[in-house]
């Protein structure tokens, strides 16, 4: 209970000793009193301790080689992209530690290096970002760029991305301000033309401009309940200068832009320049000029200086993804059936067929689970009730639908 009087006697703060006349308010507790100034001081001490805890968590950032080793446990292939991400993430958190410990007299100001990941659907963009955040034990949030609109239009404000990060950090602002945000489908909000448009582009350039502000670093007002901002709503202030933004997209068709650029160079400057090899990967040749031509505004490209290009996964890559990573799908389903005292085996030809199906559907790695679910639906429905079944074997025929999985009994 709040009071300025206690039985008409002078009341003093039990912590600082000030009287009720020297402070704005004194709160009465069980045989003790505390003034508003001591409450504010206690809050400040707690905030500082929370910041110190967050900084301590990030003071020992894994080296790039260590980060690559972690990624290799979970992500198959994409070696160049994993190296680029490991270096960028290490430098990002090293930069934060530098700014937190540097002397005021030091002139060097390390700029933030956000990341642009380009790769086809199912190549592992989201999973790479998730794995990095998990390995660093920092809050992580995913946003879909196509759901965003610029302020004043029906849709989701870009500040709601920060709300997702706050939620992932249990509303610990200091932790959230050192988290990672992955913005997917950035290519879907590309401008339709390189020419400047005089019409409003609700989900294109306008959203890019709105994203630009939080990506480059600003103090954003975040509505704690989400949705649109209201004048009466109390906002949470989030500083984005130390949040790492990883922006990704498939950029379908960008290879043609790269081919055109490389072809023009060959014609214009002779044989000493790089010729187009139809069998080579143009994804590794992407430069800022190509991304701008695709429809991303140059200001946003400038805030995404690190490019990580992911390759289309091959059948062999997908087979390895099925069985090799620490959390491989085959291991997951084997664990599920083991709870029913049933062993699960996949023939090599079955794994090949699953990978081929994913390639045909153009779903990449993200489509593997649904194919296994289709194949094993009847098994997972019936086997828990069949106590005599001890082994389930998935064959190529079971995957292509021409036969059922083989069940072996005790």
Curated annotation (Swiss-Prot):
UniProt cross-references to Gene3D superfamilies, sorted A to Z: 1.10.8.60, ClpX chaperone, C4-type zinc finger domain, P-loop containing nucleotide triphosphate hydrolases
SUPFAM superfamilies named in the record: Glucocorticoid receptor-like (DNA-binding domain) (SSF57716), P-loop containing nucleoside triphosphate hydrolases (SSF52540)
A GO cellular-component term linked to this record: HslUV protease complex
Domain of life: Bacteria
Ligand binding (Zn(2+)): 13, 16, 35, 38
Binding residues annotated for ATP, in chain numbering: 120-127
GO biological process assignments: cell division; proteolysis involved in protein catabolic process
Keyword Signal appears in the UniProt entry: no
TM stretches of this protein: none
CDD domains associated with the record: RecA-like_ClpX
Cited Pfam families: AAA_2, ClpB_D2-small, zf-C4_ClpX
Record's keyword terms, sorted: ATP-binding, Chaperone, Metal-binding, Nucleotide-binding, Zinc
Molecular function via GO: ATP binding; ATP hydrolysis activity; ATP-dependent protein folding chaperone; protein dimerization activity; unfolded protein binding; zinc ion binding
Keyword hit for Hydrolase: no
Domain ClpX-type ZB: from-to ranges: 1-54
NCBIfam families from the UniProt entry: clpX, PRK05342.1
PANTHER family per the UniProt record, alphabetical: ATP-DEPENDENT CLP PROTEASE ATP-BINDING SUBUNIT CLPX-LIKE, MITOCHONDRIAL, ATP-DEPENDENT CLP PROTEASE ATP-BINDING SUBUNIT CLPX-LIKE, MITOCHONDRIAL-RELATED
Family, per entry: Belongs to the ClpX chaperone family.
Protein's recorded name: ATP-dependent Clp protease ATP-binding subunit ClpX
Organism placement in taxonomy: Bacteria, Bacillati, Bacillota, Bacilli, Lactobacillales
Gene responsible for this protein: clpX
């Amino acid at each position: 209970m709040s009071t300025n009087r206690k039985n008409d006697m002078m009341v003093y703060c039990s912590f600082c000793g000030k009287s009720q006349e020297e402070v704005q308010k004194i709160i009465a507790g069980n045989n003790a009193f505390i003034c508003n100034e001591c409450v504010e001081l206690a809050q400040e001490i707690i905030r500082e301790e929370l910041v110190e805890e967050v900084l301590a968590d990030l003071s020992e950032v894994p080296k790039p080689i260590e980060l690559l080793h972690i990624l290799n446990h979970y992500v198959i292939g994409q070696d160049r992209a994993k190296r680029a991400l490991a270096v960028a993430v290490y430098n990002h958190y090293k930069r934060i530690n530098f700014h937190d410990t540097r002397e005021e007299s030091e002139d060097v100001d390390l700029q933030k290096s956000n990341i642009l990941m380009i790769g086809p659907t199912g190549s592992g963009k989201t999973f790479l970002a998730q794995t990095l955040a998990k390995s660093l034990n920092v809050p992580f949030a995913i946003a879909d760029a196509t759901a965003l609109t610029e302020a004043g239009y029906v849709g989701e404000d870009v500040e709601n991305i920060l709300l997702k990060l706050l939620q992932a950090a249990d509303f610990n602002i200091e932790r959230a301000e050192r988290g990672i945000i992955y913005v997917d489908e950035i290519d879907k909000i590309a401008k339709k033309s390189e020419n400047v448009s005089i019409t409003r582009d609700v989900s294109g350039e306008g959203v890019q401009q709105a994203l630009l502000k939080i990506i480059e670093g600003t103090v954003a007002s975040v509505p704690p309940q989400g949705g649109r901002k209201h004048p009466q709503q109390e906002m949470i202030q989030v500083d984005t200068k130390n949040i790492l933004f990883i922006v990704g997209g498939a950029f379908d068709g960008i290879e043609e832009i790269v081919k055109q650029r490389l072809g023009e160079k060959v014609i214009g400057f002779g044989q000493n320049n790089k010729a187009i090899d139809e069998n080579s990967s143009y994804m590794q040749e992407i430069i800022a000029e190509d991304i701008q031509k695709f429809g991303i505004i140059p200001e946003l490209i400038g805030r995404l200086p690190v490019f990580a290009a992911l390759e289309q996964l091959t059948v062999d890559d997908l087979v390895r993804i099925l069985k090799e990573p620490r959390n491989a799908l085959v291991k997951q389903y084997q664990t599920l059936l083991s709870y029913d005292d049933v062993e699960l085996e996949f023939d090599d030809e079955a794994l090949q067929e699953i990978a081929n199906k994913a390639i045909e559907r153009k779903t990449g790695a993200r489509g593997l689970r649904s194919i296994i679910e289709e194949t094993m639906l009847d098994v997972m429905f019936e086997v828990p009730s069949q106590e005599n079944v001890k082994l389930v074997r998935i064959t190529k025929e079971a995957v292509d639908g021409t036969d059922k999985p083989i069940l072996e009994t005790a």
